[in-house]
């Protein structure tokens, strides 16, 4: 029974103490190894619970002052163990051995996929329970559902056909966002139809496939890469017509966090500028 208390009850007690400002050291609190979850903790008004972050966690700006405890989904065990947090949160990509080591040390570990709207809802509900902010979590769930319903209603009433899109995550090898990925989900709400329909996740594809599918637009997420200097891209119609869209803040589209709904709205606005109503393909009468 004492062992059960140590592993299940004590971390929660420490966490609540940390969030209420009762701790005098780094003991207690939350380590987030996921940028989306770091953003969610802050959005729910519990930034004071955070004691460390991953190197990929960079928003809001204030979290950059926190110490790092590893890379995205890759904990630095010794550093985390020295911090003695109450809770570590991340997606499911954390090595099970690392997660077990943290649990054996009495640290609660919450791992769950973080890839789409349903996962986001699940994390909001979990954080509401874990961080003792049920009202804030309920409010965020209502906001998320309302934004999704708003986008879906706009799609239903749209006169234009969905634009066929390619999402470039990396250019060499050519990695794209497949079916059921987060870019696929947010793109659909922005009025895009993914040309990659059968492969899930983030598959590697060929330029020959892209030429054959002939997308209307390319959404370019490959930082520091330039298609203009690569002759292989010059035969693609979207490149020839300068319909390659580089999101101003792609992290809002690539992270399943509270900012993704604003990211969808921004993507819709960018597409509207690129494809004015008089040039967009219309739906059949």
What are these regions (language model features)?
Residues 94-104, 212, 217-236:
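A ligand-binding cleft/hinge motif common to bilobed small-molecule-binding domains
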Residues 21-29, 97-175, 193-198, 242-285:
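Extracytoplasmic substrate-binding proteins
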Residues 16-18:
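C-terminal motif of bacterial Sec signal peptides marking the signal peptidase cleavage site
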Residues 1-9:
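Bacterial N-terminal signal peptides that target proteins for export
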Residues 34, 92, 169, 199-202, ...:
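Short secondary-structure boundary segments
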Residues 29-98, 195-198:
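A short, structured surface patch at a secondary-structure boundary
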Residues 56-59, 67, 141, 175-202:
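Alpha-helical, coiled-coil/dimerization segments enriched in small aliphatic residues
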Residues 77-84, 104-105, 205-214:
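Short helices/loops that flank or line small-molecule/ion binding pockets
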């Amino acid at each position: 029974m004492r062992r059960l208390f140590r592993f299940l009850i004590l971390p929660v007690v420490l966490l609540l103490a940390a969030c209420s400002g009762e701790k005098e050291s780094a003991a207690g609190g939350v380590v987030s190894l996921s940028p989306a979850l770091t953003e969610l903790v802050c959005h729910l008004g519990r930034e004071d619970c955070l004691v460390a972050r991953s190197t990929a966690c960079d928003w809001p700006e204030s979290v950059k002052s926190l110490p790092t405890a590893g890379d995205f989904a890759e904990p630095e065990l010794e550093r985390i163990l020295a911090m003695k947090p109450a809770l570590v949160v991340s997606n499911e990509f954390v090595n099970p051995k690392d997660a077990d080591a943290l649990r054996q040390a009495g640290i609660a570990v919450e791992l769950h996929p973080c890839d789409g709207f349903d996962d986001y809802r699940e994390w909001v509900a979990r954080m509401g329970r874990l961080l003792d902010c049920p009202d804030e979590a309920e409010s965020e769930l209502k906001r998320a559902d309302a934004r999704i319903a708003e986008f879906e209603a706009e799609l239903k009433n749209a006169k234009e056909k969905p634009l066929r899109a390619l999402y470039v995550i990396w250019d060499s090898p050519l990695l794209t966002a497949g079916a059921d990925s987060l870019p696929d989900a947010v793109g659909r709400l922005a009025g895009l139809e993914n040309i990659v329909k059968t492969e899930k996740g983030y598959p590697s594809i060929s330029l020959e496939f892209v030429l054959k599918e002939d997308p209307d637009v390319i959404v370019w997420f490959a930082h520091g890469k330039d298609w203009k200097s690569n002759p292989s891209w010059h035969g693609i119609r979207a490149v020839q017509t300068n319909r390659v869209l580089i999101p101003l803040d792609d992290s809002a589209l690539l992270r399943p966090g509270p900012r993704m709904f604003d990211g969808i709205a921004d993507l819709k606005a960018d597409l509207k500028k690129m494809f004015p109503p008089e040039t967009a393909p219309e739906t059949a009468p």
